[in-house]
Amino acid sequence: MDNTLNAFLRGIIEAATEFLPVSSTGHLFLFSYFFPFQNLSVPHEAFEDLFDIFIQTGAILSVVVLYYKTLWSHLVEAVRFGLGKSTDRSGFQFYLNLIVGILPILILGFLLKSQLDQIKMRSDLLLILGMSWFVGGIIMVFVEKRHLDESSGKTIGFKESIIVGFLQCFALIPGVSRSAATIISARTMGVSKKDSAEFSFFLAIPVLTLAGIYKLYKHRQILNSETIGLLLFGSIISFIICYFIIRLFMAFIRRRSFISFGVYRILLGLLVILYFVRY
């Protein structure tokens, strides 16, 4: 497959799965397993690693564009509260929740970075992905069936942010999905579908941005005209498609539960496990 077409398709896959609770990283690995980049002038593994995180930044930018009014208004409120010019602490609490929510995965990810890199090299990675999709799907269906009532009015507070932050660490396991870990954990505490999804979006901004900066520094030696072109192209595709996917996703969950995503994970997990066992 031509590398430009490969980058285009990966950008679409990233955009379609990043903020859905189905694991974008798992889908990208599955695609690269069958359709790797060809004839690159740089080490393939390093470029694959950088490309995946780079196109995630495109998806992140779509969140910033879609929610810039919310992010900016909360920032203004936080600054005014910090300077003592306002008693409204909602903006300050918003960003405090985000900081608390990202610290566990940043710390654990840093401590385990060498082990996490080794996981991608394992011969049984497909089995790990399949099991993660399957088990995560069962948990998602179970949680949604128990929390279909949206009348509790529970919102994301400091305590909820801590719990979501720690449970987000499970997303370090390939196939678990950062979105699934954060959404499911919020839903178990009675938070609405909308608030659970949006908090997951907001958590992704600092987590994936910092991960992108780290990967860019780590693989800086492979940057050249060929790789930069593919990275930017994939990111632009991811940004454009993800902008519309998020809007469709939010419209979907206003009417439906997350059960369909759980069923999808179960079926995909079974297919991947069967493929691994057979081949």
From Swiss-Prot:
The record's Pfam families line, in alphabetical order, gives: BacA (PF02673)
**What superkingdom does the record give?**
Bacteria
| Stored InterPro entries | UppP
- Family that this chain belongs to: Belongs to the UppP family.
Q: An example of a Gene Ontology BP annotation on this entry? A: regulation of cell shape
Name of the gene this protein is made from: uppP
Disulfide bond entries: none
Q: Which species expresses this protein natively? A: Leptospira biflexa serovar Patoc (strain Patoc 1 / ATCC 23582 / Paris)
User: Which keywords has UniProt assigned to this entry?
Assistant: Antibiotic resistance, Cell inner membrane, Cell membrane, Cell shape, Cell wall biogenesis/degradation, Hydrolase, Membrane, Peptidoglycan synthesis, Transmembrane, Transmembrane helix
**Localization of this protein:** Cell inner membrane
Record-listed E.C. numbers: 3.6.1.27
Q: Please, what other remarks does the record include?
A: Bacitracin is thought to be involved in the inhibition of peptidoglycan synthesis by sequestering undecaprenyl diphosphate, thereby reducing the pool of lipid carrier available.
The cross-references to PANTHER family, in alphabetical order and at most eight, read: UNDECAPRENYL-DIPHOSPHATASE
- Its topology with respect to the membrane? Multi-pass membrane protein
One GO MF term, please?
undecaprenyl-diphosphatase activity
Keyword Transcription regulation attributed:
no
Query: Where does the sequence pass through the membrane?
Result: 17-37, 46-66, 92-112, 123-143, 156-176, 197-217, 226-246, 257-277
Q: What is this protein called?
A: Undecaprenyl-diphosphatase
**Which reaction equation describes what this protein catalyses?**
di-trans,octa-cis-undecaprenyl diphosphate + H2O = di-trans,octa-cis-undecaprenyl phosphate + phosphate + H(+)
GO CC, alphabetical: plasma membrane
Uppermost EC category = hydrolase
Work out whether the entry's keyword set contains Metal-binding.
no
**Role this protein plays:** Catalyzes the dephosphorylation of undecaprenyl diphosphate (UPP). Confers resistance to bacitracin.
Give the primary localization class: membrane
